[in-house]
Amino acid sequence: MSSGLPTLERSIELFSRLPGVGRKSAQRMVYHLLKEGGREATLLGQGLLALSERIHFCEVCHNLAEEGLCAICQDSKRDHGLICVVEEPVDVLAMERAGAYRGLYHVLGGRLSPMDGIGPDALYLDALLERLQQGGVRELIIATNPTVAGEATAHYITQLAQPLTIDISRLAYGMPMGGELEYLDESTLFQALQGRRGVL
């Protein structure tokens, strides 16, 4: 049922576009902002505007960044001989929370899914291969999600990197099949990283 207020309806529709937010949840959020007065809505609007203006993808690894390079790529104390491949920037956050990894990352921007029209060209696979061919990388850790699409992506990356003289490993299972990195607790992720195995 429409409220008869186009601005209100548009706001509800925009909030409901967010992942996991249905119309009722969006409606509650919008009414909360209205109830709190203009200040909360203004702060939220400013935050969203700053997000779209200041946050972009790292020129090297495609993680989120506020400058040309993300903080991880800029950190000289990290092990630049290790690259951990993940699907999304949120997976970098999950790995960092686990505290077990001190190398660099490469964010693919998704996973292979031919059924959804996502092929190799839709991911940052060429950029990954270019990084590996520049030399200096000892080990490539594949940390795609343990889903069918994640496994297919891991297999593709393995085939892509196989001709290079680097070790290739995959996170150990302790991670549930069908699970997503961002939802794993730090302990499970720590154990999976410590128990990673070679794929060749």
Swiss-Prot record:
GO BP term, example: DNA recombination
Keyword DNA repair among UniProt keywords: yes
Pfam families named in the record: RecR_C, RecR_HhH, RecR_ZnF, Toprim_4
Top-rank taxon, per record: Bacteria
Alphabetized InterPro entries for the sequence: DNA_Rcmb_RecR, Rcmb_RecR, Rcmb_RecR_Znf, TOPRIM_dom, TOPRIM_RecR
Family per similarity comment: Belongs to the RecR family.
Name of this protein: Recombination protein RecR
Organism expressing this protein natively: Magnetococcus marinus (strain ATCC BAA-1437 / JCM 17883 / MC-1)
Gene: recR
